Amino acid sequence: MQTGRGFDSHQLHNQMNSPIAKWWKPIKGVNQMSLSKVLCTLCPRYCKIGDGQRGFCFIRKNIDGTLYQEGYGKVIGLAVDPIEKKPLNHFLPSSTILSFGTAGCNLGCKFCQNWHMSKVKDDNKISQYVTPEQIVKVANDNGCKSIAYTYNEPIIFGEFIIEVSKLARQSGLKNVMVTNGYITKEAREEVFQYIDAANVDLKAFTETFYHNLTYSHLEDVLDTIKWLYNETDVWIELTNLIIPTHNDNRYEIIDMINWILENCSDKLPLHFTAFHPDFKMKDLPRTSRDTLNGARKVARNMGMKYVYTGNVSDSKSQTTYCPQCKSSMISRIWHSVIPFWKLTCDCGYKLEGVFK
């Protein structure tokens, strides 16, 4: 197909910084219309995308039977954060991290806390094009120890992650993904190949919740968590956003903890965080501190060693305690680490995590 001034449409998209996507294949059809459809294989949604259309995530588009990654380098929200904000409590504590995202998401969470980015339909209005080299330079210039792919769902801009994370590692920086974990087996090894740590958002522990409130499936997320913890060197922590009346049932929390203990470890850090009314779920109250601490108590009583609360100010529940003697090792207030923290307790216990 030709466009104005004799440009081929594929060449035009490449000039506009939209590279051909990595994970897709053409759909073999029985008529001319189906010949131009493509199957995206990046996430378990497996979108079948017609010519000129986008996938569910918004930033992957079919042009003349070729799938393009239209979010490549279109950065939103470039900012320096404390790493505890991700949240990661056992990965380079007290360091700063350069964070960014793009438009779009491969889930449809009705409670999305970043909907102004994940649900945007014209990313050109709020994004700026930034090269991988520029991102790494900004991180180094600001004294950051790592780069976070976050805010929306980074899986959907996996091609860009690979380029940035490779350069970051070469320059001595660590790489962090804050992710919903909704990715296929075909894509995950490439996307995570240079990732050092991940916080996976385990949104609930029922298929009903995932189906009705996120338009996705729980089992695919659990498979990613198991793979990350058992088959990679990625440091992993989990976050569970507790939403009143939807996933705050004590028995659901017990089921989730049992699964973590059976499939991962009692030393996997777990963050229970507070929901605030947003997007399509503004009719619900904020999560109470008592609810968060109740979930934390259940998890600790079941044997989890590192359980935290978030989105509330509670130094006690945000402090890291020695699993052996219960003394404080890393004290925090909100996202700040109080000085004089230690990685080896006075009793001799060495804290699990990545610290250099």
Residue ranges and their predicted role:
Residues 109-113:
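The canonical Cys-X-X-Cys-His
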Residues 132-287:
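Conserved AdoMet/S-adenosylmethionine-binding subsite of the radical SAM
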Residues 84-88, 107, 127-139:
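Short, charged beta->alpha transition segments
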Residues 56-66, 71-78, 122-135, 336-346:
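Short cysteine/histidine-rich metal-coordination sites, predominantly Zn2+-binding motifs
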